[in-house]
Amino acid sequence: MGGRSRNCGLAVALLAMVSVPVMAQTCTTQAKMASDTRTALANEALLLGSAVKAGDANAVKAATVAEYASNFAPIEHAVDTTSEKLKGDTLRVTQVYLLDASTRKAGDTSDTEFTCPLKDTTSETDFSFSSLPPGVYGFAMVEAAGGDRSWLLSFLLLQQGSGWKMAGFYPHPRTAVGKDGLWYWTAARANVKAKMPWLAWVQYDEANELLRPASFVSSTDLDKLLAEQRAGAPPALSDGISVQTPLVVKGTGVQEFHFTAIANEQAGDGGSLHLVLHYAAEPLAGAEPNRVRDAAAAEAMIKAHPELRQGYGTVIVFADMPGQNPSVLSLPMTEIR
């Protein structure tokens, strides 16, 4: 869904996207990797995952590259909040990749892409970075499962001497309300066939969020998912939805709302889903006028596309205003006429 990312990626400025020439580098999958390298990457990832699960931010900091260890507060916050979600989970390293960018020149701002064909299939996993410093990197995925919720802890690792240091941490849930990404993908397909494209759009996006290890990682399957989402999109969303391409929905009278994002959000207890709406707005004087306008925005969206009522107990509306924090309204779906 345009304009939204739940991924807590913390590596960096070095991943910012720019429109410049692309440089291809070398990727080695775990099936073709030297056993000692594969073991070293997996061991480091498991140590980091165990430290995150234990809430041991000091151990994570000690294993982090100096650039991010010196400004560790965002990573420490991610460690603290993620560790709370992993109680009762067992950690297992499921995938490691070796990404060799050692031939890049220092200061090179071109894009760097790694194409990783998977053994005995026609599928591949791809990585795309920009302004990636020269070096040898590893990407490791640690699955956390067995507790109340499944999570994925992905780590970008940089080889330093004979060891590895963390250069990026990307935790995110693998399920929403007890359902995994494949479930949401299947549900989206069914709703396209059932002529409910708006609900399908949100479900495709949820599937993408749950299945994608990090924002800079793609795969043959994820490309297929996004192609299906585009093919089944309502005409109003054919160009996506974002600040640049808002969805305009009429309210009462001459009122209209410019929505910039439609998303799912799991409730804190993991037991239900919220429908999350963002729209562009100008500041109003006082809390009550903002609340009334936010409620009107939610009502306009649900009235225009009533299928979005399905599966959601609450609508959370963000009125994004220039130069200040958004106003936020949480509205039970039962209160929306």
List where the protein language model places each region.
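Intrinsically disordered, low-complexity, charge-biased linker/tail regions
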Residues: 102-105, 115, 236-277
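Acidic, serine/threonine- and glycine-rich low-complexity intrinsically disordered segments
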Residues: 173-255
